[in-house]
Amino acid sequence: MIALCAALLLLAGPPQADPDPRALIEKAARSYRAITSFTADFKQVIADSMIGTYESRGRIVQAGESRLAMRFTDPSGDAIVMDGEHIWVYTPSTTPGQVLRLKLPTDPTYGPNVLAWILTDPARRYESRYLRNDQVAGRGADVVVLTPRDRTLPFREAVVWLDQFDNLPRKLEIRERGGQVRTLTFTGVQTSRRVGPETFTFRAPDGVRIVDQ
């Protein structure tokens, strides 16, 4: 019996090594740089021990580091838009009657573009480790944990599900320094589609006050 078990182990061969997480994230960064746009439906879940869990959905369109539109269908009307010069944060669901206008940061890691957070020079910015093989919406994904080397970055850990076909993120779990955990899941991803400039234009509705910060 012992001899049989030993023979079976020999036939099975040595255990397969995990993929190199640094190579995976660098490959994802190259794929990200190669596309001209990223479009997807998103589901966002923010978990906070103080305020509970907040779930939202919508559509995200991103083109380069400085142009992004997150337009929410739930809550309807909310939007975060980067137009190349400013970040517009419009949340009538919680703060009606005003829109915040912020100057665009020079470092994309400090703006709302979470893809740029993760995929801008990741080998230099983060320590990485391979977590597991998984699936997102039926697609194979490699799960990598990133820990910032720079403690001034706005999060202390990010778990990234990298699609095994196009290498781009399909899910992000970001542990922010304030204690919140934000999870973004992308479905229906399309890349390098032509995106008109109006996508990244925000026009304040009549009667809405613009608050500069």
Language-model features: locations:
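N-terminal leader/targeting segments and the immediate start of mature chains
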Residues: 5-54, 65, 204-213
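Extracytoplasmic/secreted envelope proteins and their assembly/folding machinery
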Residues: 22-25, 29, 112-116, 159
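Extracytoplasmic
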Residues: 35-37, 55-57, 63-67, 75, ...
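Extended beta-sheet lipid-handling architectures
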Residues: 40-42, 55-60, 174, 184-186
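Short hydrophobic/aromatic-rich beta-strand segments that constitute the beta-sheet cores
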Residues: 42, 68-72, 87-90, 146, ...
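Hydrophobic lipid-interacting interfaces of membrane-associated proteins
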Residues: 45-48, 75, 151, 179
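An acidic-aromatic
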Residues: 59-111, 182-183
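Gly/Pro-enriched, hydrophobic low-complexity segments
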Residues: 114-117, 123-207, 211-213
